[in-house]
Structures are given as structure tokens and as C-alpha cells.
Amino acid sequence: MKSCEVNFDGLVGPTHNYGGLSYGNVASQSNSQQCANPREAALQGLAKMKALMDLGFTQGVLAPQERPDVAGLRQLGFIGSDEQVIEKAARQDMPLLVASCSASSMWVANAATVSPSADTADGRVHFTAANLNCKYHRSIEHPTTSRVLGAMFADAKHFAHHPALPPVAQFGDEGAANHTRFCQDYGQPGVEFFVFGRSAFDTRYPAPQKYPARQTLEASRAVARLHGLSEGGVVYAQQNPAVIDQGVFHNDVIAVGNGEVLFYHEDAFLNTEPMLNELRDKLGRVGGQLRAICVPRAEVSVQDAVRSYLFNSQLLSRPDGSMLLIVPQECQANASVWAYLQRLIADDSPVAQVKVFDLKQSMQNGGGPACLRLRVALKETELAAVNPGVIMTAPLYDTLTQWVDRHYRDRMSENDLADPRLLIQCRTALDELTQILKLGAVYPFQLN
């Protein structure tokens, strides 16, 4: 049976703004308080989705969250009508309103961890929504994420959904941004690669000193258990604490994997050689042969990797067996990174082509091509069971671009978030979106 890996990209929400909410994310912090353009952000994301669809890749779309999060503000003590809640929050605690308006759910690499059916004990595709416990503005996402994923992958014969892990620091889980799967073929058993920043309970593991390590070993192990993964099909690797302190807040900022290829920076991991040996051995047992591409620090510094988001790229398999690397424009603008990429495709490497995309609105908030997509490997029967409304087609692209043009503002500053009309505009847009994508009722305002 044929299998493919589908990229489900996050649709940027109507409240996209530069709130500077993500401590440890250099781009997010450095662009704080700038004026954002939600319409441009959403259209840039849709353009990438359509381009990959046009290249022959199966492409999906994942809906944004309801923002402002009025229910969350009520939980924190603001009372009155929805408009009064927003007005009071703006007057009394503007940073909290900014957090409650974040469009960070666009980075769906953090939405969940996904294990394909070939790896799981019960032969179903498993999803665990990420608790994103490290940051308030992201910790409020998982209830809606779970409902949206449930509406997209509804057939219990093929799909299993798990709620987020307990929302405490010991089980901090950032989803697929710290998870990669290696395999010889998407439909065959593979090796799932979980990267953690620290251990909550075992002091033998080092931890970063400046910025928080958002993913714990304990969370990664819990997800592997929930998904019914075998010990022989899992490798746990620790991210280098020194690079976390340089702004590498997720593993997908310093490494990317696909198929049998791991593309990573020399400083990405601790104990790199033993980890590679374990990965090579376990992948070999399921018929694969690891190809590790190490980018030397002498050619690309960690700082340049973070600035350009070289590793926050999409590594995609083409029908001829070669790979395509999707990178943001910032890679082309960085001399050392671009020179390295030219050497990479000229060498005898699996990467045959580099394709550049303008994702500036997302990049300025700290999210590149890989942040914007959730990968789901599916067999033909499983793909047929996915809600067809969320699979990108030329007509759906046209419908969504028109929807964005109708509902999105072209300017969003902190003051705009206090406008009570914004809530009405967002709910109107999302209500229409659930009909376009055939999701049913998934947002709090639709459920109440």
C-alpha cells in the first residue's frame, strides 16, 4: 500500500502581532512591539502551501485558534460582557491581553506529536496534543488543538487522540518541534527520534543556564508510551544546553530529519556519536540506512543558523528519491549559510534542490517553514479517512485567499488588540472558516 507524508500547515490567525512573548526566541524578542500585517502573514503561509501542492506534494491546512481568548481572561478574573472583559484587560493588564491575542498557533509543529500507524502497537495513527506548558500564551492552545485535530482525523478505526500531558514543568511538551521520524519508507516501521532539553527528575542531565529548556525527557517518554512505541523504535537525544542558551529553543531550529537523512549542526546535540550509533543501529534493523549530514560550526555558526533559520527548513522527499529543502529568504540573505547550501547541493548529498520562500511575517516572530507545518505520515486508506475539507486544492486555495482578504486587517499593533470590534471580526471569520474546512463546531464561541 502506498504511503505519503502530508504537511498540514498552520493558517495564520487574524490577530497576528509582534508581542515579544517568547523568552528564549531571539526573533520574537527582537521584533517585539513592531506593527504586524496579519493579512500578509496569512497570504505568505498560503502561498507556501499552494507552491508545495503545485510541486506534487499532498498538502493540508490546520485552522487557527479563537483569539482574543476571552474565556481565559474570565478565568483570570475579568468579568462583564466579552467587550468589557477586553476593555478591562487592556486597561488593567495589557501584557496579559497581548498574550491572550497571540496567533502563535500558526506554528503547528508545536500542536502535537504524531506517530504513524506502522510504528504503533495498535496500528493506528496516534496524536498527542502538546501542553506547551512553558509559555502562557501557548499553554492555552491545546484544548482547541485537540478539537481541531479530532475533526480532521475523526475515524477511530484509523486515528487515536490523546489529551495533552499534565500541565506542569516536569512534563513540558513542545510537540513535533522536538520530534523527527526516520524510515526507509513512510509506510514501513521507522525510528522515532525524541529530543529533550532537560530531565525533570534526573539531575545527571545538564540543563541550560540562560534560557529555559522547554521539553523534558519525561514528557518525551510519556508520549512514546501513549503511542505504543517499541523500545527498538525510539531514540532519545539531549539537545546541547549551550545552543539553547544561544536561542535554539526547539530542536527544529538546529536540526531537521526526513526519511533516512538527519541534517544537523555540529553543536546540536550532546553525546552526538553514541546517539548517531544508536540511531544508525535501530534504523538498520527496520531496513533503513542513516545518512547524517553534519554542518560544521566552522562553516555556519550557531548564531547564523539561528538568524537564518537554516535548520527550520522542510526536507521533502521527491519521487526520484532525492530531497528538496524549503528555506526562508533569510538563508539567501546570509552569506555563510547561502554559500554552504550551494556546496550542499553541488556535493553528492541527498539534497538536490533548495527552494526559497518569503515568510517574513512569521520569521520576525520566530517561526520558519518547519514551525508552520505538522507532518503526518499516512497510508492510502488513512489519507482517504482524513476530512477532505482540510486537504489543499486549487479551489480551496482560492477560497482561503479570498477569505483572508475579506476578514484580515493589514495592520496590527498592540493598541489594535484592545479594539472590541476585533473580537467580532475574528469570530465572524472563524465561523466561516469552520464551514469552509468542514470542521463543525471547534471554537469556544461555537460551543457555548
Swiss-Prot record:
Residues bound to substrate: 19-28, 110, 137-138, 214, 252, 365
Key word Acetylation present: no
UniProt-listed Enzyme Commission number(s): 3.5.3.23
Pathway(s) per entry: Amino-acid degradation; L-arginine degradation via AST pathway; L-glutamate and succinate from L-arginine: step 2/5
Example of a GO biological process term: arginine catabolic process to succinate
GO terms assigned for molecular function: N-succinylarginine dihydrolase activity
Residue positions of the active site: E174, H250, C371
Subunit structure: Homodimer.
Family statement: Belongs to the succinylarginine dihydrolase family.
Protein name: N-succinylarginine dihydrolase
Organism of derivation: Pseudomonas savastanoi pv. phaseolicola (strain 1448A / Race 6) (Pseudomonas syringae pv. phaseolicola (strain 1448A / Race 6))
